[in-house]
């Protein structure tokens, strides 16, 4: 078992990572007896894991209820958010209630945002069940819902009290979802840790075989990197923006094609190739480094191409709404090597177009 701390002074919290954590109530023992707890999940995850979590809470002495939401990125919106608010209000829950987000990134983002808003803020716990949510979205306090005009445009920075990661959850995850999570795992190597990138190149097969030691190693390294970055820059005014490698292009794909048609990690993978090609055209990385990035994403069974139906104009329409845009100036996260990246402003549009068109040929 690995334990990592996100250091944010009085708002610091632990991340527990291991196999079989859903069998041990110790990870929820910080909850007081008779504590009211609402477990919020979706119709896919709840039948698999809700009873286990409710049983742990019962052993701790909590009073529990379960809310099941529809499953899918298309439900990460204000309508679903409102249904959570209605459930909480109709249940007469006061400010001492704790909510648990049991699911993937959609559940974590939506429930975290609901927790930040309900009666101006209540405690919540992240129990992520997908690889993507375990290595990325459950850590760091970004919470949000989507708007038809842009992804994650309505949200807040709001930290959980604890993150509990049971790697055994990944045994029920479809391979497509696992691959989507690998896009975020690979991202950490590209932007922050060349040695980890090399380790991933050598251990992809073990990860896809769900080797326990390999999974814990990879998830722990990703969480440690994110914890380090968030401790330095919680609200993304500096270094935290680097965690958005591939996301400016990727969010454009999701918004244009409709949320849920491409998984978030699939869009990030395609976006990472476009960002890497942009960097290579700008002279920031070599052809060999570009090829390593493309190769590892391809070997991880991820898309590396541009969606055929999307024009350059489609991309720019959405990218100019990106949260990193300042004073009308598009800023892109670009790799400067394997293991380093920076935010680059004012990339010429013809370079961006070349990068997008390059990915059409892959």
From Swiss-Prot:
Molecular function as annotated in GO: 3-dehydroquinate synthase activity; metal ion binding; nucleotide binding
Residues at which NAD(+) binds: 71-76, 105-109, 129-130, 142, 151, 169-172
One Pfam family in the UniProt entry: DHQ_synthase
Transmembrane intervals: none
Record GO cellular component, one term: cytoplasm
Cofactor(s) named in the record: Co(2+); Zn(2+); NAD(+)
BP-aspect Gene Ontology terms: amino acid biosynthetic process; aromatic amino acid family biosynthetic process; chorismate biosynthetic process
Keyword match Zinc: yes
Cofactor binding comment, as recorded: Binds 1 divalent metal cation per subunit. Can use either Co(2+) or Zn(2+).
Keywords recorded for this protein, A-Z: Amino-acid biosynthesis, Aromatic amino acid biosynthesis, Cobalt, Cytoplasm, Lyase, Metal-binding, NAD, Nucleotide-binding, Zinc
Catalytically driven reaction(s): 7-phospho-2-dehydro-3-deoxy-D-arabino-heptonate = 3-dehydroquinate + phosphate
Pathway where this protein functions: Metabolic intermediate biosynthesis; chorismate biosynthesis; chorismate from D-erythrose 4-phosphate and phosphoenolpyruvate: step 2/7
Residues binding Zn(2+), per UniProt: 184, 247, 264
Location of this chain's protein in the cell: Cytoplasm
Enzyme Commission numbers on file: 4.2.3.4
SUPFAM superfamilies in the cross-refs: Dehydroquinate synthase-like (SSF56796)
Domain of life: Bacteria
Similarity field: Belongs to the sugar phosphate cyclases superfamily. Dehydroquinate synthase family.
Function: Catalyzes the conversion of 3-deoxy-D-arabino-heptulosonate 7-phosphate (DAHP) to dehydroquinate (DHQ).
Listed name of the protein: 3-dehydroquinate synthase
Source species: Vibrio atlanticus (strain LGP32)
């Amino acid at each position: 078992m690995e334990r990592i701390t996100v250091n944010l002074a009085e708002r610091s919290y632990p991340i527990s990572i291991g196999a079989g954590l859903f069998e041990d109530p110790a990870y929820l023992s910080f909850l007081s007896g008779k504590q009211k707890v609402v477990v919020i999940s979706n119709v896919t995850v709840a039948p698999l894991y809700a009873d286990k979590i409710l049983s742990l809470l019962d052993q701790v002495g909590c009073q529990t209820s379960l809310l099941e939401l529809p499953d899918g990125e298309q439900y990460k919106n204000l309508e679903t958010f409102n249904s959570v608010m209605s459930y909480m209000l109709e249940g007469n829950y006061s400010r001492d209630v704790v909510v648990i987000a049991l699911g993937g990134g959609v559940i974590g983002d939506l429930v975290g945002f609901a927790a930040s808003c309900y009666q101006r803020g209540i405690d919540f716990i992240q129990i992520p069940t997908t690889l993507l949510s375990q290595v990325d979205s459950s850590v760091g306090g970004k919470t949000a819902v989507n708007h038809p005009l842009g992804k994650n445009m309505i949200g807040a920075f709001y930290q959980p009290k604890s993150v509990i990661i049971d790697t055994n959850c990944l045994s029920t995850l479809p391979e497509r979802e696992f691959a989507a999570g690998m896009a975020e795992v690979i991202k950490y190597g590209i932007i922050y840790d060349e040695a980890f990138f090399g380790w991933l190149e050598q251990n992809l097969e073990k990860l896809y075989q769900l080797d326990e030691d390999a999974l814990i190693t990879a998830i722990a390294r990703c969480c440690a990197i994110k914890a380090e970055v968030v401790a330095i820059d919680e609200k993304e005014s500096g270094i935290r923006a680097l965690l958005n490698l591939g996301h400016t292009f990727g969010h454009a794909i999701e918004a244009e094609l409709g949320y849920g048609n491409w998984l978030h990690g699939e869009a990030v993978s395609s976006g990472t190739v476009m960002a890497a090609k942009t960097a290579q055209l700008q002279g920031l990385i070599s052809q060999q480094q570009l090829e390593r990035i493309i190769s590892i994403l391809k070997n991880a069974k991820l898309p590396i191409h541009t969606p055929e139906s999307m024009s350059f104009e489609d991309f720019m329409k959405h990218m100019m709404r990106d949260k990193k845009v300042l004073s009308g100036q598009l800023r892109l996260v670009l790799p400067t090597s394997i293991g380093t990246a920076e935010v680059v402003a004012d990339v010429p549009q013809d370079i961006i177009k070349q990068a997008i068109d390059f990915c059409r040929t892959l």
